[in-house]
A protein has these predicted regions:
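Short aromatic loop motif centered on NTY/YTY
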Residues: 165-220
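Sec-dependent N-terminal signal peptides
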Residues: 4-13
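Sec/Tat signal peptide C-region and signal peptidase I cleavage site
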Residues: 16-20
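Structural signature of eukaryotic scaffold interfaces centered on beta-propeller domains
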Residues: 124-133, 185-193
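Short, surface-exposed coil-to-beta transition loops
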Residues: 119-124, 138, 142, 149-154, ...
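Mid-length scaffold segments of soluble, non-membrane domains
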Residues: 132-169
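Surface-exposed loop/turn elements that mediate protein-protein interactions on large endomembrane-trafficking
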Residues: 96-114, 158-170, 215-219
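Terminal domain-start segments
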Residues: 21-127
Length: 220
């Protein structure tokens, strides 16, 4: 019986670890040029679909299912461990949000009673901004809420409407991350409304406030 309980705990921990590694792995490997069909007409779906071909995974799978059926999906990753996807597509705003809530019914845990519901949230934002050159700045931000701590990743690409390519913009990422002291646990919230970025700031007194990173016309 103890062996079965141990295996169940290991499976859950591995599940959270794998999820956290999604953001961590992307943070290490995002700087790739991505081919997109050249066009003066840009949509968030077009940019995200091209990005998703380079970086497939559960977020992309959920979005593709949403496009086909009008809803995302709920899957049982392990026994009593569910992952529920939701998609917010706002074409006029140039914005996509894909979120999951991992729900686990606790069996054995020092911090939970048997039968308690444990929820871990994960989220992906995608958005784009118009640049003075006519090109677009495309952003991806990911937060994976792990068992112990969150793993976050941020990426920016410049979309050349004439060449049809998403080229990584590491300097833009560097500028934004410098504001949050390069903290890999800070989730940068891309805008559904407006152009500015936001993030949660935790001060030493335990107060939580939203801070803004202003859009400056060509970047942040």
């Amino acid at each position: 019986m103890k062996k079965l309980v141990l295996l169940a705990i290991v499976a859950v921990v591995l599940g959270y670890t794998a999820k956290a590694q999604d953001a961590e792995e992307f943070r290490e490997n995002w700087q790739k040029t991505i081919t997109v069909s050249a066009s003066q007409t840009t949509t968030i779906e077009k940019l995200f679909t091209a990005w998703g071909k380079q970086f497939p995974g559960q977020y992309v799978d959920a979005f593709n299912k949403f496009k086909k059926t009008g809803k995302a999906n709920k899957i049982e990753v392990y026994e009593n461990f569910f992952r529920d996807f939701k998609v917010d597509l706002a074409p006029r705003n140039g914005y996509i949000e894909i979120s999951t809530a991992d729900t686990m019914i606790a069996q054995v845990d020092a911090n939970f009673r048997k039968g308690d519901t444990i929820v871990r949230k994960h989220i992906l934002n995608a958005a784009y901004w118009n640049l003075p050159s006519g090109n677009k700045l495309f952003g991806i931000s990911i937060e994976d809420d792990g068992e112990i701590f969150a793993e976050c990743a941020l990426a920016f690409y410049e979309y050349d409407v004439n060449k049809g390519a998403l080229s990584p913009s590491p300097q833009m990422v560097k500028k934004v991350m410098a504001i949050v002291n390069d903290d890999p646990e800070t989730f940068i919230i891309l805008p559904k409304e407006g152009r500015d970025l936001k993030y949660l700031d935790f001060n030493p007194h335990g107060n939580i406030t939203y801070k803004t990173i202003k859009w400056k016309g060509k970047g942040f």
